[in-house]
């Protein structure tokens, strides 16, 4: 993927219908331009993603030996160190160590579409964007800039984009449902998140297809990722009010811990009455009582695939993606029944 040369000050001046000097004055807060003209020029420069910084313009013309990592799920959460959620640090650690083995540095970048954008952020050799959203503005920015990128998880808005890798989530979800069924479950609830990414969208599609294949009526509940344990506990009460199921699969460990707390308050025994599992392992699932069955994501293998895809994309080579890796489902006490007829 060839990088674009970027927007120049002359491009901004032409779009705004003013001189190059006027653009410079508007962006630097100098000169005698009217307030209206200054605001209009700045708005046009921002719309065109113009980089006024000379360092950024210079770096963009050559390799800097560094790539960016954008954690879209953390951007959406509004916090970058959620308590007890270690899956993101595992991906960050794996990507950083493996990149260094290849002579690359990794820069963690919060949503680069939010102003002001650090100049270096748009001068990196490429990007890994995790869990892109529908019509993701970060992907849009990278596309406009001609910056090579790959994604952790498919881009739901770009079905023809193949430079992505992830765990085989469809297989993982089906394995959990089959585990529930083998332990006697005849009614299974899915609690998913609300972020508009492929993980949420595809997991619900997988769940509904599996339910149809075995003749189970689907029951889907949603709780915003940022609601965490509190959101899971609230949903647990709604689930019980609607009819206690044999099993519940939650997307996140925080949701699962909250659901466990809510079920306990309502007197629903886990796993004897209702089995429980999470699609993403965390401190919450490991330290709950009972410990909650969960999918341990394969950060090491997945980030290796992402780096392979990104380096090939930077070099302009054909896509070898998508790549699916294998996660591990850890069965714990929350879904382990001694009597499968319970």
Listing of model-derived features with the role each one plays in the protein:
Residues 76-78, 82-87, 110-115, 165-175, ...:
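Hinge/beta->alpha junction and helix N-cap segments in small-molecule ligand-binding domains
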Residues 133-174, 254, 280-292:
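Flexible loop/hinge segments that line or gate small-molecule binding clefts
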Residues 114-123, 232-243:
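Short, well-structured alpha-helical segments in soluble
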Residues 39, 50-116:
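Amphipathic helical "hinge" segments at domain boundaries
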Residues 1-66, 339-342:
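N-terminal helix-turn-helix DNA-binding module of bacterial transcription factors
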Residues 19, 65, 125, 186-187, ...:
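Short acidic/polar active-site loop segments enriched in Thr and Asp
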Residues 219, 241-342:
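Flexible loop/turn connectors
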């Amino acid at each position: 993927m060839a990088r674009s040369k970027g927007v120049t000050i002359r491009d901004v001046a032409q779009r705004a219908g003013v001189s190059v000097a006027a653009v410079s004055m508007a962006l630097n807060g100098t000169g005698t331009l009217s307030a209206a003209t200054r605001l209009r020029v700045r708005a046009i420069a921002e719309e065109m993603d113009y980089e006024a910084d000379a360092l950024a313009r210079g770096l963009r013309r050559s390799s800097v030996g560094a790539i960016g990592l954008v954690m879209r799920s953390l951007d959406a959460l509004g916090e970058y160190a959620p308590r007890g959620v270690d899956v993101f640090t595992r991906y960050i650690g794996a990507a950083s160590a493996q990149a260094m083995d290849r002579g690359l540095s990794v820069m963690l970048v919060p949503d680069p579409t939010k102003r002001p954008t650090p100049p270096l952020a748009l001068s990196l050799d490429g990007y890994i964007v995790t869990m892109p959203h529908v019509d993701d503005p970060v992907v849009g920015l990278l596309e406009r800039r001609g910056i090579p990128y790959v994604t952790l998880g498919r881009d739901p808005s770009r079905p023809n984009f193949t430079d992505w890798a992830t765990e085989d989530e469809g297989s993982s979800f089906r394995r959990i449902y089959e585990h529930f069924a083998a332990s006697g479950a005849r009614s299974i609830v899915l609690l998913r998140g609300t972020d508009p990414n492929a993980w949420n969208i595809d997991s619900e599609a997988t769940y509904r297809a599996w339910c149809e294949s075995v003749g189970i009526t689907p029951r889907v509940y949603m709780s915003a990722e940022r609601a965490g344990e509190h959101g899971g506990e609230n949903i647990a009460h709604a689930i019980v009010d609607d009819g206690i199921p044999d099993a519940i699969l939650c997307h996140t460990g925080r949701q699962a811990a909250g659901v466990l707390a809510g079920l306990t308050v309502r007197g629903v025994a886990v796993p004897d009455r209702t089995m429980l599992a999470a699609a993403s392992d965390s401190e919450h699932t490991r330290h709950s009582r009972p410990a909650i069955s969960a999918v341990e994501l394969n950060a090491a293998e997945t980030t290796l695939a992402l780096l392979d895809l990104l380096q090939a994309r930077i070099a302009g080579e054909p896509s070898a993606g998508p790549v699916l890796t294998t996660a591990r489902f850890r069965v714990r006490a929350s879904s382990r029944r001694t009597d499968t007829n319970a």
